[in-house]
């Protein structure tokens, strides 16, 4: 799941499911850990990551919060992958399962458009001139 391009030092919240072989919701067990990988690197971090298994008492629905202000690991102009690095579902390892991705200020922003309308200039009264 793509969580989009985020602002520096933001907090990211998302949920993800786990299911057993018959597709029924199942608990993420085995002292689960969610880690974050930066760019194309093999270094993972758990800084600022909080995992709540079976969120709100709902089996198989898990909540992750990532506080990107928690560590210098989270830097602008980078892409990140969120991965299960420890855990099982029905005694089967789910290590390496990617659950989300995001970036921090790493996407092109077209400053020549306002509300998806190409703009050459904006007047003092707020009028827009189309290109």
Task: Please give the residue ranges for each predicted region.
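Polar, enzyme-active/binding microenvironments
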Residues: 1-131
